[in-house]
């Protein structure tokens, strides 16, 4: 896809793990970012859509109507709900943007990327396996642990000072 072919995504999908236990964890930064978008753009409350394995809301960014979707599958099975969502709405993969945590970026840093590998992220691995890789991603940095205990790090809550990703905003142009 060349820069002249890139169009604004129609669906923003936040990755995370369902349940109170994981609220506020680094791994749930995708959910959190969607909540911030919904609040900023006055979107209705997310409504559970069991047939899609997730919760859905609608918003308007700069006059563009978009869907906001939170997968209710655990991170490692995210591809199942994304596949179902794409099939249900008959979407091409390049119309979605996956929002996820990224250990390789400093906390509070965000990067937009189109296509590519999973970079060790099991949620992306699941999506790429079941759907392909030609989608947008907003990678939100959560920093890297000082130890090799990555699982406990991403499933834990960051310190208050580290939660600078709450001030990120969505670019209006890709």
Please state what every model-predicted region is.
Residues 2-114, 125, 129, 134-136, ...:
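Nucleotide and nucleotide-moiety/phosphate-recognizing core
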Residues 71, 142, 157-160:
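Active-site donor-binding loop signature of nucleotide-sugar glycosyltransferases
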Residues 111-117, 154-158:
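Short glycine-enriched, charge-decorated loop/helix-capping segments at active-site entrances
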Residues 120-123:
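Hydrophobic alpha-helical segments within soluble ligand-binding/sensing domains
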Residues 137-145, 154:
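Glycine-rich anion-binding loop/nest that anchors nucleotide
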Residues 148-164:
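Short, electropositive alpha-helical surface patch
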Residues 166-174:
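Conserved small/polar residues in nucleotide/adenosyl-binding loops
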């Amino acid at each position: 896809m060349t820069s002249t072919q890139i169009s604004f995504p129609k669906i923003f999908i936040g990755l995370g793990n369902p349940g109170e236990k994981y609220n506020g964890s680094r791994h749930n930064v995708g959910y959190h970012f969607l909540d911030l978008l919904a609040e900023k753009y006055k979107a209705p409350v997310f409504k559970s859509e069991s047939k899609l394995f997730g919760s859905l809301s609608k918003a308007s960014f700069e006059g563009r109507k978009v869907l906001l979707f939170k997968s209710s599958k655990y991170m490692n099975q995210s591809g199942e709900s994304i596949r179902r969502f794409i099939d249900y709405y008959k979407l091409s993969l390049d119309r979605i943007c996956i929002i996820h945590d990224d250990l390789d970026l400093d906390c509070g840093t965000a990067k937009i990327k189109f296509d590519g590998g999973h970079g060790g992220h099991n949620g992306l691995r699941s999506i790429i396996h079941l759907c392909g890789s030609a989608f947008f991603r907003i990678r939100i940095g959560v920093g890297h642990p000082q130890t090799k205990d990555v699982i406990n790090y991403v499933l834990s809550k960051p310190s208050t000072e580290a939660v600078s990703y709450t001030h990120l905003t969505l670019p209006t142009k890709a």
